[in-house]
């Protein structure tokens, strides 16, 4: 079941990317909020 392993790895990868994007967004929002 290579597909199952691949899809689980892929979803893990997507989760990591989403988390990083969220953190980046959070930081930039905080930065913008501090600037105003």
Swiss-Prot record:
Single GO molecular function? hormone activity
Keyword Secreted found: yes
Task: Write the record's keywords in alphabetical order, separated by commas.
Answer: Secreted
The entry's protein name is Glucagon
Localization recorded for this chain is: Secreted
Checking Pfam families in the record gives: Hormone_2
Region forming the signal peptide: none
Source taxon at top rank: Eukaryota
The Swiss-Prot or TrEMBL record describes its family as follows: Belongs to the glucagon family.
As for what it does, the entry says: Promotes hydrolysis of glycogen and lipids, and raises the blood sugar level.
Any one annotated GO CC term:
extracellular region
Q: In which tissues is it expressed?
A: Produced by the X-cells of the islets of pancreas.
Extract the InterPro entries matched here.
Answer: Glucagon, Glucagon_GIP_secretin_VIP
Tell me which species this is from.
Hydrolagus colliei (Spotted ratfish)
């Amino acid at each position: 079941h290579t597909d199952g392993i691949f899809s689980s790895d892929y979803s893990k990868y997507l989760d990591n990317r989403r988390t990083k994007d969220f953190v980046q967004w959070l930081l930039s929002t905080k930065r913008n909020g501090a600037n105003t």
